């Protein structure tokens, strides 16, 4: 039930835009309606600047570092006074002979070039080196020319616009190409600080590089950024860190958290296709302009790269809500594969100039997005553990140590089974909407009894469409609709479920309001974009518009409803299609909220819900919700099928298994039934079904829950059969971390767990055998002690 959202213009006019100091970008044109990120296109990287002619650049060869005079006995550089601004650097890779020691830990050593602030990190035991610039050994093979050759060598790139020119287009400039000067360079206790001065465009961007025990961090200090007459749009800091080109006999890939995760594999034949990956962390912000796309939102601010035995995993630690992930395959911009955060400071939006028409112009806001620090941490992996499973393991450790996630404690030896029960929905009638009953509270008890009678244990119920008016009636959720049994009927059902030790969560959406209840007035309480337009969602079933609720207004409503959930006896709330899943700024002056403030508001709702009721479930949750949720429902288990992305991987599932339970799509709505069942087994996901007591086809035409095959009686036998297989595969490893994942052969996948158990899934229509194991066609086996070498 994930939804796209659209914008509808309001009374905002051009005069308002001009008075607010907004920037005209180009003449009005057709306006895409759906909130998401732009598709791959070279122009999205920013038009090259003509600030300088391209310089041919030959990189200096690698050299041994000088003796560590600047290091203390403990191996860490002492803070040094700030140096004067450096002369403009040459258009070339930094000379490694001039690098100096900056910091050292037990595992790593940091070196820096005080002319460019480029750095390299050495793994002391293995001798492997990660550079913030292209590998000098591979650079002579680079054939790209012009501005992008300079961009690849630069420690920082910026995209900007000239606000004083109404015809200005966004341009990209590198610090090297813009006659860059390095100001205020100084060594610190953990690394170094410096300010990149773009002398042509007049940007000054202060940064820091600091080393941890097994990682290195890059930092941008937003509040110290200086702009001249031009307006900063985004920044890529050390974009080529860890970059690599294809090598024969060497496995290499980029990991992007698209959906469940995906690989961009290194390939020998570069096509010069300018396609690349670019996606907003936590999805698009509906308060700004977004192109239509089917790409999965980016839920986890993490990425990685492997080149042979050398690998890193990058984490956007702070400021990620204003970040995008940018990944370029080899051939897009030179021979190198690279992946980096793209930090957003301004973004485009549509300034409407009419009430009812979609006329207006695209523009950028005057104010920058600002957070205290924008931090990227690069964990450097050891040579023997450098695949994507090792990256996920390192990220999981980070979530436990720094984000408050805790290892899971299963309540039963049986795996969880999630039953979504649909109370009611509405569909279009002759004169007014028609109410469709799916499951009364009495019938809900019958569903539970049927599941228990068929041997399905460890059951959790999520009851949706219980509110007055059914699932598609948004706003004023309480009381429970009398046609389903009212509050008393719901209490009786929950009491019965509790007698069987079954928790009941009530499904709720506070993101939309279609009925004006709760004192909601769209004009006063609706979420607004930067032009002042009230934002609305278009229901694809009936094309009717529903107002998006201001996040702070929604938080107040959710908090006020907690006492009523508690009175019913609910064990928690399942937030779907909103809280914990979508993140938007709000320019409603009554409830103004930046993206950062909206994030904290959502975290507050989740925390209050858990404290009041004991449990919180979220649909396909973003990272910032994970430390509060008990369960992630309908977690993405595939990817967006970009043409340059090669294959999906269960990166998110490897991270989460053993920390929080998760399901994939409802089992009775699978498109490829057997393959998707096997994928759930491979990914360690638990079973979930959506049920009604009404017969199949009864919900046809409903605005939201229109699915045909939901009659629980049609699924009891199949659900019980699958539940046994889920228990066979996952019952013993509910609290175990996934430690490995690989292909044994085409369409034969192995998932390894702590303690030695492995699950081998064969998607082929023929049996698989390798002399150690035999896996039947379209089936799986469990190997308790793991595969022998």
Feature names for model-found ranges:
Residues 2-12:
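N-terminal Sec-pathway targeting helices
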Residues 460-463, 506, 566-579, 680:
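Hydrophobic transmembrane helix bundles of membrane-integrated enzymes that assemble
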Residues 11-21:
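Hydrophobic membrane-insertion alpha-helices, especially the h-region
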